[in-house]
Amino acid sequence: MNQNSEGCMKKISSVNLDKLINDFSQIEKKMIESSGKNNILDMQLEKANCLLRVMQTKEVAMKQGENEQLKRNADLMKEKFKMHEQEHRNNIAKLMSEMKIKEEGHKIEKTKLYQDMQKKVKLSEEKNKELIEKKELEISELNAKLRTQEREKQNEMIKLQLEFDAKLARVQIKTKSYPDSTVSPHSIYKRKLQHLQEEKDKEIAVLRNTVRDLEQRLSVSKDSQVKLVGKDPRFKRRRF
């Protein structure tokens, strides 16, 4: 009985060992397959990680390149802006200089024009003054001549009146001797005296008209001078 039991145990042990070996072989095979798959996965993962690092490096490089390009563009824009700003300042300075030169030119031109106008006004004043003095002298001489002629006329009228009275007295004495005389000596002397007075009156009237005409011309000349001075704004400022 013991022998049978031992034989049975050996048989069971032999069967279990084969199965165990077989199972181990299967497990080892699966482990090898699994290890191979894991290696493949590790390789793929490493490859993926490598690609990821390359992509990240490339992205970083691209970003750095873009940043550098943007920075260069920004620096270039700043430089262009500075150049435009400096050019604008230069243009403004140039325009200011031109405006100052033109302003100085206008100022010189205005000063010259003012001086020329002053010279013309002064020359016109001197001419008008000379003309007025000349006319006033003529008027004074004519007035003196008129007064002289009036005195002469008065003296001559008195003289003629005295002569007429004397002649009239003599004629009256003679007419007493010749009562039939048709022509009255009194009327003859009276007509002569009247004619002489008319001639003197005409001369005096001519002189008075001449004086009046000269006075009118003198007044017109003075008015023209006043208007000329009044119309000149620069002359007004000078007088003020």
Swiss-Prot record:
Keyword check for Coiled coil: yes
Gene for this chain: CCDC152
Native organism: Bos taurus
UniProt KW keywords: Coiled coil
InterPro entries: CCDC152
Coiled-coil ranges (or none): 55-223
Protein name (record): Coiled-coil domain-containing protein 152
